[in-house]
């Protein structure tokens, strides 16, 4: 009995490792699902657009085209039928023969042209936006030109005070010359007058003495 007891716990660890292997096996399955190609609707529209039959493409011919593109038709048979019905309801495909998924299908030219027109409008809008951005550039050039005008005006203001200072100096210099000349003349006249007055007084005194 003592020998059989340790054997039971030794068998337990392999049972715990088994779930880890199952989890590792599940991960690749998830990766395969993500790596699936484009949706069925896109493949159907491409196959119908590639066909040159005027009456439309039958379901059998459609399946052959999808199988040639590498799509598993047998597993995704129900998806193909649902994709056809949804494309017909959206107006992308037109059913020329039969009802439901069984019949012939043709690409709707109006729907294809309607999809092309919005793309053309977007391209036209993008072109219209570009000239608006180009028109903004000249505004920057005018802004850069304004400092030049301001720089030209400043020297003119500096020249006017200099010219005014020159005229003031010219006007002041003649006034000084006029003031100095009369002063010299007055001093000369004052010096001459006393000399002339003294002899007259002396003559008068001599005449008075003679009369006595």
Curated annotation (Swiss-Prot):
List of residues that carry N6-(beta-hydroxybutyryl)lysine: 34, 52, 64, 85, 90, 106
Modified residues (N-acetylserine): 2
PTM characteristics: H1 histones are progressively phosphorylated during the cell cycle, becoming maximally phosphorylated during late G2 phase and M phase, and being dephosphorylated sharply thereafter.
Similarity annotation: Belongs to the histone H1/H5 family.
GO BP field: chromatin organization; negative regulation of transcription by RNA polymerase II; nucleosome assembly; regulation of transcription by RNA polymerase II
Position of the signal peptide: none
Subunit field text: Interacts with TSC22D1 isoform 2.
Compartment(s): Nucleus; Chromosome
GO CC list: euchromatin; nucleosome; nucleus
Protein name: Histone H1.2
UniProt modified residues of type Phosphothreonine: 146
Modified positions (ADP-ribosylserine) in chain numbering: 187
Record-linked InterPro entries: H1/H5 (IPR005819), Histone_H1/H5_H15 (IPR005818), WH-like_DNA-bd_sf (IPR036388), WH_DNA-bd_sf (IPR036390)
Region called Disordered, residue ranges: 1-41, 98-212
Modified-residue entries (N6-(2-hydroxyisobutyryl)lysine), positions: 23, 26-27, 46, 52, 63-64, 75, 81, 85, 90, 97, 110, 117, 121, 129, 136, 148, 159, 168, 212
Phosphoserine PTM sites in chain numbering: 2, 104
Biased composition (Basic residues): 20-35, 149-160, 169-212
Modification type Citrulline: residues: 54
Residue list for modification N6-methyllysine: 34, 186
Main location: nucleus
Alphabetically ordered keywords of this record: Acetylation, ADP-ribosylation, Chromosome, Citrullination, DNA-binding, Hydroxylation, Methylation, Nucleus, Phosphoprotein
Modified residues (N6-acetyllysine): 17
Residues the record lists as N6-succinyllysine modifications: 97
Classification via Pfam families: Linker_histone (PF00538)
Species of provenance: Mus musculus
């Amino acid at each position: 009995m003592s020998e059989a007891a340790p054997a039971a716990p030794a068998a337990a660890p392999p049972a715990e490792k088994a779930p880890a292997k199952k989890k590792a096996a599940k991960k690749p399955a998830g990766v395969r699902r993500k790596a699936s190609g484009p949706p069925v609707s896109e493949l159907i529209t491409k196959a119908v657009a590639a066909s040159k039959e005027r009456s439309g493409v039958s379901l059998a011919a459609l399946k052959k085209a999808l199988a040639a593109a590498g799509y598993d038709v047998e597993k995704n048979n129900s998806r193909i039928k649902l994709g056809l019905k949804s494309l017909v309801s959206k107006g992308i495909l037109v059913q020329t023969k039969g009802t439901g998924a069984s019949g012939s299908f043709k690409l709707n030219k109006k729907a294809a042209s309607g999809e092309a027109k919005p793309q053309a409008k977007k391209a036209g809008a993008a072109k219209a936006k570009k000239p608006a951005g180009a028109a903004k550039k000249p505004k920057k050039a005018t802004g850069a030109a304004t400092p030049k005008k301001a720089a030209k005006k400043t020297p003119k203001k500096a020249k006017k005070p200099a010219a005014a200072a020159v005229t003031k100096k010219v006007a002041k210099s003649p006034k000084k010359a006029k003031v100095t000349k009369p002063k010299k003349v007055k001093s000369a006249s004052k010096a001459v007058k006393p000399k002339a007055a003294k002899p007259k007084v002396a003559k008068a005194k001599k005449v008075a003495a003679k009369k006595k």
